[in-house]
Amino acid sequence: MDSVDEESWSCENGIPSWRSARQEQYHNYIIEEVYPILMQKNTSNMLPIVTGPSLGANQAAITFLRRPELFSGLIALSGVYNSDYFFHGWCDENLYKNSPERFLENMPADHPYIRLYNQKKIVFCVGQGAWEYDGAQTLRNLKRIFDEKKINAWCDFWGSDVSHDWYWWFIQLRYFIPILLEDQG
């Protein structure tokens, strides 16, 4: 599925408030328009898994972490989960809601989503090779937050030979999808 990343995350010269509003519109579009159609066409009793690589991992993580009741799991590959990397420290309410590292850090320990997260299968994966530094750094931060909040998320750091590339994302998906589908019926 396409995104509006060129109008939000990657639009470096855009007005920050417009960019963050565009991202929030995209999130709402996924939840309010795409998800109902997906579920209407879903002939199984399983909730969907949300997944994506690179900026798609960021979008997948935002979607899952903000609405865990709608999905059975998450596979996020090589994402950057802190809005500072794209907005250079600027933040408003819309951007806050779309920056997993920010909103999870401030989530109360008794928030009902934590129980929901722990009923799901959550996988974050990043390589440690070319173009993976920022993703690895933000995943280390997320792992710390998950550990502090007692959220059972699998944060997997692959080797220094694993680069930010489709070749590796296909390998990772072939590895993780069967794990997420276990016990799905």
Where are these regions (language model features)?
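Non-catalytic cap/lid and distal C-terminal segments of serine-dependent acyl enzymes
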Residues: 1-185
